[in-house]
């Protein structure tokens, strides 16, 4: 079953509110309906089909066991990105994008290993022989690593696609993804450029209601793709049994 969002839901979430007209990026002109009170209004008749297309891509990817990394490190996006990525079992970055997270993944994997080792020490604190101060320092280090790497610690390799809230804020992420040929689904507001974004979603990237709508829609698409894949496996098994 498909759970594509509707035009009404987009309007209610304020997806159509862009930035102040003086901050606009002319490359977004084709997605802009007009302006009101010096605020650009995004044309939802453009946004809706583009978002549906992005969801369809994610469904196909998830049905083929693909991975979509959710990225949203600005204040309004953090909690939403973390919740929705966790709901659909996908990796996420919600704290700070560390340079090389994709392009230097080998080093990142070593940091994840270090995080796991230190956590294991903390869990067996009684038998380790560490004193109180050493354990406290260790706990601080684990918390710091967890903030940066917690969302990607179960990732088995590079993601197959990246879903980004606010392409201007996450420039570093997009540069790394492009270098590696990883497709990017990006929410692009009127003050940013759609260049280099494979699946452009023109929309408000500041409102938490709008951010929730995008993240939930992509997470739903992941779950639907996986469910479809499971149905196909079950159907194939039943056919084989019948034969």
Swiss-Prot record:
Instruction: Give the residue range of the signal peptide.
Output: none
Q: What PROSITE patterns does the database record attribute to this sequence?
A: RIBOSOMAL_S2_1
Q: Which domain of life is it from?
A: Bacteria
The alphabetized UniProt keywords are: Ribonucleoprotein, Ribosomal protein
A single cellular component GO annotation:
cytosolic small ribosomal subunit
Q: Name one GO biological process term.
A: translation
Q: What InterPro entries does this protein map onto?
A: Ribosomal_uS2 (IPR001865), Ribosomal_uS2_bac/mit/plastid (IPR005706), Ribosomal_uS2_CS (IPR018130), Ribosomal_uS2_flav_dom_sf (IPR023591)
GO molecular function terms noted in the UniProt entry: structural constituent of ribosome
Q: Which family does it belong to?
A: Belongs to the universal ribosomal protein uS2 family.
**PANTHER family (UniProt xref):** 30S RIBOSOMAL PROTEIN S2 PROKARYOTIC AND ORGANELLAR, SMALL RIBOSOMAL SUBUNIT PROTEIN US2M
Note the HAMAP family from the entry: Ribosomal_uS2_B
- The name under which this protein is listed is Small ribosomal subunit protein uS2
Q: Which organism is it from?
A: Chromobacterium violaceum (strain ATCC 12472 / DSM 30191 / JCM 1249 / CCUG 213 / NBRC 12614 / NCIMB 9131 / NCTC 9757 / MK)
The UniProt gene name for this protein comes to rpsB
């Amino acid at each position: 079953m498909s759970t594509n969002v509707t035009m009404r839901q987009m309007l209610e979430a304020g997806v159509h509110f862009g930035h102040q007209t003086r901050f606009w990026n002319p490359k977004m002109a084709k997605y802009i309906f007009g302006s009101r009170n010096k605020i650009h209004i995004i044309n939802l008749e453009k946004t809706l089909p583009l978002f549906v297309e992005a969801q369809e891509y994610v469904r196909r990817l998830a049905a083929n066991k693909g991975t979509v990394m959710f990225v949203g490190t600005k204040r309004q996006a953090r909690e939403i990105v973390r919740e929705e990525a966790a709901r659909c079992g996908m990796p996420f970055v919600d704290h700070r994008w560390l340079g090389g997270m994709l392009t230097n993944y080998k080093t990142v994997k070593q940091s994840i290993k270090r995080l796991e080792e230190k956590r294991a020490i903390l869990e067996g604190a009684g038998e380790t022989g560490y004193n109180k101060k050493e354990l406290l320092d260790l706990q601080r280090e684990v918390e710091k690593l967890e903030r940066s790497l917690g969302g990607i610690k179960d990732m088995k390799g590079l993601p197959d696609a990246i879903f980004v809230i606010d392409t201007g804020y996450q420039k570093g992420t997009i540069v790394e993804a492009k270098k590696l040929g990883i497709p990017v689904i990006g929410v692009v507001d009127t003050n940013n450029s759609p260049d280099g974004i494979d699946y452009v979603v023109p929309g408000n990237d500041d409102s938490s209601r709008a951010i929730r709508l995008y993240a939930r829609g992509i997470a739903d698409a992941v779950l639907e793709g996986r469910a479809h894949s499971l149905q196909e496996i079950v159907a194939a098994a039943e056919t084989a049994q019948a034969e």
